């Protein structure tokens, strides 16, 4: 089983408008910002929904690592850059301040279109996730503390091969479970016993 957990809330205040350079700086500051302390009730709720034994993975970004440290202080996570949030770079050069939503929206549009301005293009991310599939299959239980857009992208790719739940919106500290196994024997056995 693969369980994805989105990182805790980041303590960062976005401005309403940015120049291209300002937007890039804000993104870098957000990546270094601290996270909110996780409440005891949230810790219990998350931990209670997990298997007893699992392999822990995080991205290489501070918010993912810090969230994992609060959730699982006795575990040392395996950090993989492929699990990091898919960054949004300025979609154009501009000294004129533009609204934050424009930077975010058009940057994602470029990402979906594999525009080279977005350095980690959709094609590159899909290739990274496909390469990680072998790790997913080899491990019995995995927990990944990751990022919202990266998680949604991963779930879309996993859904091509495996039964996964795909929520529309993944809030901070939300959990998503995926049953990742080879379809040949285990999948057919699952279908027969579940009556699907």
Question: Predicted segments — roles?
Answer:
Residues 1-82, 101-130, 173:
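Active-site-proximal alpha-helix that buttresses catalytic centers in soluble enzyme cores
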Residues 2-3, 54, 138-148:
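Generic beta-sheet signal
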Residues 8-11, 62-64, 84-86, 148-151, ...:
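Short, solvent-exposed loop/turn segments at secondary-structure junctions
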Residues 22-25, 162-192:
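Domain-level recognition of soluble alpha/beta enzyme cores
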Residues 70, 74, 135, 157-161:
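Active-site catalytic microenvironments for nucleophilic, acid-base chemistry
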Residues 82-97:
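Signature for phosphate-centric chemistry
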Residues 96-112, 185-196:
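A polyampholytic, Gly/Pro-enriched intrinsically disordered region
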Residues 153-155:
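Catalytic DNA-binding helix-loop module of base-excision-repair DNA glycosylases/AP lyases
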């Amino acid at each position: 089983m693969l369980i994805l957990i989105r990182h805790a809330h980041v303590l960062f205040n976005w401005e309403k408008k940015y120049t291209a350079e300002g937007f890039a700086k804000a993104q870098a500051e957000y990546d270094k910002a601290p996270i909110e302390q996780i409440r005891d009730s949230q810790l219990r709720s998350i931990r209670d929904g997990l298997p007893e034994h699992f392999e822990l993975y995080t991205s290489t970004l501070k918010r993912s690592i810090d969230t994992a440290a609060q959730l699982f202080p006795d575990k040392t996570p395996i950090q993989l850059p492929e699990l990091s949030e898919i960054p949004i770079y300025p979609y154009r050069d501009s000294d004129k301040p533009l609204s934050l939503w424009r930077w975010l929206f058009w940057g994602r549009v470029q990402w979906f279109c594999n525009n080279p301005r977005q350095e980690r293009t959709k094609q590159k991310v899909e290739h990274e996730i496909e390469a990680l599939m072998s790790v997913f299959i080899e491990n019995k239980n995995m927990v990944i503390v990751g990022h919202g857009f990266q998680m949604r992208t991963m779930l879309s790719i996993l859904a091509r091969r495996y039964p996964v739940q795909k929520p529309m919106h993944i809030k901070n500290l939300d959990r998503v479970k995926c049953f990742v196994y080879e379809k040949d024997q285990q999948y057919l056995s699952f279908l027969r016993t579940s009556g699907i």
